[in-house]
Amino acid sequence: MAGHSKWANIKRQKARVDAKKGSLFTKLSRAIIVAARNGLPDPDANFRLRSAVEKAKAAGMPAETIERAIAKGSGNWADDSPLEEIRYEGYGPGGVAVLIEAMTDNRNRTAAEVREAFSKVGGSLGESGCVSWLFRQKGVISLEGVTDPEALLLAVAEAGGEDLKVEGTDAEVYCDYTLLEQVATYLKKEGYQVQEAAIRWIPSTEVHVEDPETAKLVLTLMERLDHLDDVQNVYANFEIDEALMESLA
């Protein structure tokens, strides 16, 4: 998972640049709309909405844009484009399994765009369930400003977390997805800087990609999918050496 995690970190570092293009704000607005629609329109009483709002604020989204998205989700703002959540699955170069979460107001458009992204790198969009069995859902909490990994490990155990990965001053805490709010709230109360808390698909097995050309195609696929406005999250089970990853980033 290290290769995919490295790609995810690179993607987060580019977030503010993407936001200037409007792509990230579109994705974040949709996440807020759906979260507000599926629960209470109050971030304090809706963990999914609160997480979406915090992520939007971290990306620099204006408060009025956030409020408008919440209003759309709660039905207090005219919105003639109802969104639905869809999952796509397929195989990329080198047999890498790819799972995509999307929010769309047009299934046909989104499916066509996702299929094209796969076909351009020699991959293929598959049927529902073709790769999801290679992943498991986990709650993942991203932290920054970590100075004492041992103290954090104890806090994670107290909170009910399952695993911890630290890289420099950044860390990722893994837990049962049903305990995500509990663990994230505990860590915040303990003074840790929670950058993001979300349910993610974590690969159970990995595909090691060593060929530079194949690795380049895999990363190209990830970028193309991530740049689609309808796509919210992209997960894959590739493992690429960090040096190779950095040379291609």
Curated annotation (Swiss-Prot):
Main location: cytoplasm
InterPro entries in UniProt: Integrase-like_N (IPR017856), TACO1_YebC-like_2nd/3rd_dom (IPR048300), TACO1_YebC_N (IPR049083), Transcrip_reg_TACO1-like (IPR002876), Transcrip_reg_TACO1-like_dom3 (IPR026564), YebC-like (IPR029072)
Subcellular compartments: Cytoplasm
Extent of the signal sequence: none
GO biological-process terms attached to the record: regulation of DNA-templated transcription
Organism domain of life: Bacteria
GO molecular function, one term: DNA binding
Protein name: Probable transcriptional regulatory protein CYA_2259
Alphabetical keyword list: Cytoplasm, DNA-binding, Transcription, Transcription regulation
Record-stated family: Belongs to the TACO1 family.
GO annotation, cellular component aspect: cytosol
